[in-house]
Curated annotation (Swiss-Prot):
Origin superkingdom: Bacteria
Gene name of this polypeptide: rplC
Protein name: Large ribosomal subunit protein uL3
Lineage, uppermost ranks: Bacteria, Thermotogati, Thermotogota, Thermotogae, Thermotogales
Family affiliation: Belongs to the universal ribosomal protein uL3 family.
Self-association and partners: Part of the 50S ribosomal subunit. Forms a cluster with proteins L14 and L19.
Keyword Repeat among UniProt keywords: no
Length: 210
């Protein structure tokens, strides 16, 4: 599996064949291989990659990076691999750049949506609310949530006010429009979850469209 970490820069548009296409610009990589995990010791195949250099680091992480002979990195994530043959193609300290992807390729993007705090049912779930009339006693309340005599309770899992946003979301099969290797920029068709500057994970698609 191909994967790289990045930061969302923002959205703009490109004109291709006189057609306006909304795109998202992501600054992705370079990432560095910090650790290799094999089935004999760890029980599975994976590599640990780091992203964004860090000035200050605690003692345990300092030893971890010193063993890999790479500079301290802010973010660490694992890439699961299928077998040891794929694991052998990576080396500790190896740099992973955007050249692993090509324009026209499909990718999956994982990000964290904007956190909107404690929100009511209308904003969080799109409830219609009550009548907007003078005689109405409620305008933005949830209304009837359960039954009266039987079962005389509200079932668990009912949509109610609560924390809205800040959830991990994956968008599948976004098309790579353009790649700028010199500036580590990736241009993707459509929108990507998260605020500007938030972490995103770009990886090869789990499922392909027929």
């Amino acid at each position: 599996m191909k994967m790289i970490l990045g930061r969302k820069i923002g959205m703009t548009r490109l004109f291709i064949n006189d057609v306006s296409i909304p795109v998202t610009v992501v600054r992705a990589g370079p990432c560095y291989v910090v650790q290799k995990k094999n089935p004999q010791i760890d029980g599975y195949c994976a590599i640990q990659v780091g992203f964004e250099h860090l000035k200050r680091v605690n003692k345990p992480l300092e030893g971890h990076f010193k063993k890999a002979q790479v500079k301290p990195l802010r973010l660490l994530r694992e890439i699961r691999l299928e077998d040891e043959n794929e694991l052998d193609s990576y080396e500790i300290g190896q740099e992973i750049k955007l050249d692993i992807f090509q324009p026209g390729e499909k990718v999956d993007i994982t990000g964290w949506t904007k956190g909107r705090g404690f929100s009511g049912g209308i904003k969080r779930w799109g409830f219609s609310g009550g009548p907007r009339a003078h005689g109405s006693k409620f305008h933005r309340e949830l209304g009837s949530l359960g039954q009266h005599t039987e079962p005389a309770k509200i079932f668990k899992g009912k949509k109610m006010p609560g924390r809205y946003g800040n959830e991990r979301v994956t968008i599948h099969n976004l098309e790579v429009i353009k790649i700028d290797l010199e500036n580590n920029l990736l241009v993707l068709k459509g929108s990507v979850p998260g605020a500007r500057g938030s972490l995103v994970i770009i990886k090869s698609p789990r499922r392909t469209r027929k």
